[in-house]
C-alpha cells in the first residue's frame, strides 16, 4: 500500500474591502478541514480625507498580514451600483486590499459576491443571516465582530474550496 503524502495546512486571508470598514478573516485549510484563526476589521476614522483613509486601510492590512502570515489571499470583487462615485471609491479600497498582500509576495485571488454566497451557503443570492448560520457550522470557534469580518471569512472559505478543486483538476490532468 502506497503511503499518502502529508497534507500541509495552508493559511488563507479573506478580505472584504470597504472605505468605512475593511473586513479580514484568516483560516487554515488542510484537505477538506477548515480551521478558524482570526478575524476583524480595519476601520479608518470617517473624518479623514480619502487618501488618509486608504493609507489607514493599507497600514491596518499590512499589520494583519505581518501578524498572521497567510500564504494566499482572496478579495471580493466590487459590484457596480447606481452611484458611480461610490463605486469608484470602493474600487480604490479594493485596490488597497489587493496591493497589501501582493506587497508581501502573497498570491491574490478574486471572487464575485454571488460566488462567495453560492460556495458558502449553496445559493448565490443568500442574505447575511444565512452566511452567519453557515459560518457557525463551518467555523464553530469563529465569532466575527462585524458583518464585514464574517464576509471576509466567507471569502477565505470560498478560496479554500476553489483552490482544492483546482488542485484536484491539476492532479487528474497529470500536471
UniProtKB/Swiss-Prot annotation:
Active site positions: 16, 76, 148
A Gene Ontology BP annotation from the UniProt entry: DNA recombination
Keyword Lipid biosynthesis: no
The protein, known as: Crossover junction endodeoxyribonuclease RuvC
One annotated GO molecular function: crossover junction DNA endonuclease activity
Taxon lineage: Bacteria, Pseudomonadati, Pseudomonadota, Alphaproteobacteria, Hyphomicrobiales
Family matches, as Gene3D superfamilies: Ribonuclease H-like superfamily/Ribonuclease H
Disulphide connectivity of cysteines: none
HAMAP family with a match to the protein in the record: RuvC
Cofactor(s) demanded: Mg(2+)
Source organism of the structure: Bradyrhizobium sp. (strain ORS 278)
GO cellular component terms given for this protein: cytoplasm; Holliday junction resolvase complex
PROSITE patterns: RUVC (PS01321)
Family: Belongs to the RuvC family.
Role description: The RuvA-RuvB-RuvC complex processes Holliday junction (HJ) DNA during genetic recombination and DNA repair. Endonuclease that resolves HJ intermediates. Cleaves cruciform DNA by making single-stranded nicks across the HJ at symmetrical positions within the homologous arms, yielding a 5'-phosphate and a 3'-hydroxyl group; requires a central core of homology in the junction. The consensus cleavage sequence is 5'-(A/T)TT(C/G)-3'. Cleavage occurs on the 3'-side of the TT dinucleotide at the point of strand exchange.
UniProt-annotated binding residues for Mg(2+) 1: 16, 148
Gene symbol of the encoding locus: ruvC
Documented EC number(s): 3.1.21.10
Subunit structure, as described in the record: Homodimer which binds Holliday junction (HJ) DNA. The HJ becomes 2-fold symmetrical on binding to RuvC with unstacked arms; it has a different conformation from HJ DNA in complex with RuvA. In the full resolvosome a probable DNA-RuvA(4)-RuvB(12)-RuvC(2) complex forms which resolves the HJ.
Cofactor binding note from Swiss-Prot or TrEMBL: Binds 2 Mg(2+) ion per subunit.
Pfam families associated with the record: RuvC
UniProt cross-references to NCBIfam families, sorted A to Z: ruvC
Reaction equation(s) it catalyzes: Endonucleolytic cleavage at a junction such as a reciprocal single-stranded crossover between two homologous DNA duplexes (Holliday junction)
Localization of this protein: Cytoplasm
Amino acid at each position: 500500500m502506497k503511503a499518502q503524502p502529508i497534507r500541509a495546512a495552508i493559511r488563507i486571508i479573506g478580505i472584504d474591502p470597504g472605505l468605512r470598514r475593511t473586513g479580514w478573516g484568516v483560516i487554515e485549510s488542510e484537505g477538506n478541514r477548515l480551521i478558524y484563526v482570526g478575524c476583524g476589521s480595519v476601520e479608518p476614522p470617517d473624518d479623514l480625507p480619502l487618501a488618509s483613509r486608504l493609507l489607514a486601510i493599507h497600514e491596518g492590512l499590512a499589520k494583519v498580514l505581518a501578524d498572521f502570515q497567510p500564504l494566499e489571499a482572496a478579495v471580493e470583487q466590487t459590484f457596480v451600483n447606481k452611484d458611480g462615485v461610490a463605486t469608484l471609491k470602493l474600487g480604490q479600497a479594493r485596490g488597497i486590499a489587493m496591493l497589501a498582500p501582493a506587497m508581501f509576495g502573497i498570491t491574490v485571488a478574486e471572487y464575485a459576491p454571488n460566488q462567495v454566497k453560492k460556495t458558502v451557503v449553496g445559493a448565490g443570492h443568500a442574505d447575511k443571516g444565512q452566511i452567519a448560520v453557515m459560518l457557525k457550522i463551518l467555523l464553530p470557534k469563529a465569532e466575527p465582530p462585524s458583518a464585514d469580518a464574517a464576509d471576509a471569512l466567507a471569502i477565505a472559505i470560498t478560496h479554500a474550496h476553489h483552490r482544492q478543486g483546482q488542485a484536484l483538476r491539476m492532479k487528474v490532468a497529470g500536471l
